[in-house]
């Protein structure tokens, strides 16, 4: 039980059973603890350490505007290398002083959060600052890159699209407001909020910023991902030759992006 609690304190209190078993398996061997996955699950259940499922959805998208809306360039396609496709989204963070907002730019292949910005407004500059950080953090700046988002006014604003295009980035957007059209970004929002405490009402913006910084670091460098064959985003991003097969079973055959 101590190993489980120590790992969750380090990586995230909502880390599930499969990831726990995978990460702790060598520790069990080192301490001569003989336990299989099913028995480990029973142990978690017995001690009420299984993570309950949660569900919620609140929109932060306002697509009723006159700005140009771009075509969806990635429909039914998946990336095959880092910095081929970035996905962006905004999520709200509750504080005792009112809502703050967290803009994220994530690499769709490695799942690494490339840039982020937290503030008490949803102006275009929130997203532009996150994108600027992502561009600064590029490891492969000569690679062609698509930026995919919903049709929110921040992403359609010429101040944002022109900044992206000036940096060699091609814009792509969802066809309609449906979170499943930007599923990678939505999933990351959910993970940060539910696994790293950003779902709760936080005392103030300074504390929210500190928690966001810590959450992004853990997410990128310490947390394993089913979609990366239980690898860590930073490792996959640094090593583009590493090809992974998603741990999740997916019956949909999608073509690879060709840019």
Segments (PLM) and residue ranges:
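Hydrophobic (often cysteine-bearing) scaffold residues that line and stabilize catalytic clefts
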Residues: 16-17, 36, 70, 83, ...
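An active-site-proximal beta-strand-loop segment
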Residues: 79-114, 120-121
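Basic, flexible linker segments flanking DNA-binding modules
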Residues: 1-82, 232-242
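C-terminal domain-tail junction helix/linker
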Residues: 165-169, 191-259
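Mobile genetic element proteins and their domesticated derivatives, centered on retroelements
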Residues: 4, 20, 40, 74, ...
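Short small-residue beta-strand/loop micro-motif enriched in glycine and branched aliphatics
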Residues: 112-116, 172-174, 198-199
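Active-site beta-loop-alpha junctions of metal-dependent nucleic acid enzymes
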Residues: 98, 117-140, 156
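RNase H-like two-metal-ion nuclease catalytic core shared by retroviral integrases
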Residues: 61-63, 149-151, 157-161, 171-193, ...
């Amino acid at each position: 039980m101590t190993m489980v609690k120590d790992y969750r304190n380090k990586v995230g209190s909502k880390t599930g059973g499969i990831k726990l078993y995978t990460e702790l398996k060598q520790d069990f061997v080192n301490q001569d603890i003989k336990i299989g996955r099913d028995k480990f699950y029973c142990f978690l259940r017995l001690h009420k350490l299984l993570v309950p499922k949660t569900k919620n959805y609140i929109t932060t998208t306002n697509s009723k505007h006159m700005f140009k809306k771009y075509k969806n360039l990635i429909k039914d396609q998946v990336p095959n290398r880092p910095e081929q496709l970035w996905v962006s989204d905004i999520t709200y963070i509750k504080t005792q002083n009112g809502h703050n907002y967290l803009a994220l730019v994530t690499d769709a292949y490695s799942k690494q959060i490339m840039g982020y910005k937290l503030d008490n407004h949803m102006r275009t500059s929130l997203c532009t600052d996150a994108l600027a950080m992502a561009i600064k953090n590029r490891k492969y700046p000569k690679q062609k890159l698509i930026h995919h988002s919903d049709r929110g006014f921040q992403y359609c604003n010429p101040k944002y699209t022109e900044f992206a295009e000036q940096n060699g980035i091609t814009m792509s957007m969802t066809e309609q407001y449906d979170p499943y059209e930007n599923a990678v970004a939505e999933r990351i929002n959910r993970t940060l909020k539910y696994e790293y405490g950003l779902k709760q009402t936080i005392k103030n913006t300074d504390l929210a910023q500190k928690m966001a910084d810590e959450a992004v670091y853990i997410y990128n460098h310490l947390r394993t991902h089913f979609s990366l064959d239980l690898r860590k985003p930073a490792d996959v991003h640094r090593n583009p030759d590493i090809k992974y097969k998603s741990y999740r079973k997916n019956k949909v055959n999608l073509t690879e992006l060709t840019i």
